[in-house]
Amino acid sequence: MLKTTLLFFATALCEIIGCYLPWLWLKRGATPLLLIPTGLALALFVWLLTLHPAASGRVYAAYGGVYVCTALLWLRVVDGVKLSHYDWAGAIIALCGMLIIVAGWGRA
């Protein structure tokens, strides 16, 4: 379970980086050269999705919970925004949903 969760976090981080870099370019006028690491991050994201040991729809559903938590960590660390009680509650609920889905992978 820990290995799968870490794989989900790595996958989410690649997806967020792959979306954040073009956002910097379009929204903040950063260099278009950011599109090069964007492509690499998104290619790595797709490859990491193939490493998950379940049907793709189930992987995407479980991954969503970890993505929520990773995005909130990004909000705090990169954007410098303090998380609210609602952020924490939502992250816990999303993570619990992911854990329930992953726990059932071998039983479905």
Swiss-Prot record:
Query: Which keywords appear in this protein's UniProt record, sorted alphabetically?
Result: Cell inner membrane, Cell membrane, Membrane, Transmembrane, Transmembrane helix
Q: How does it sit in the membrane?
A: Multi-pass membrane protein
Pfam families the record matches: UPF0060
Query: Which InterPro entries does the record cross-reference, listed alphabetically?
Result: UPF0060
GO CC, alphabetical: plasma membrane
Q: Which residues cross the membrane?
A: 6-26, 29-49, 61-81, 86-106
Q: Where in the cell is it found?
A: Cell inner membrane
**Keyword NADP: yes or no?**
no
Coiled-coil segments? none
Protein family membership:
Belongs to the UPF0060 family.
Protein name per the record: UPF0060 membrane protein KPK_2870
Question: What is the native source organism of this protein?
Answer: Klebsiella pneumoniae (strain 342)
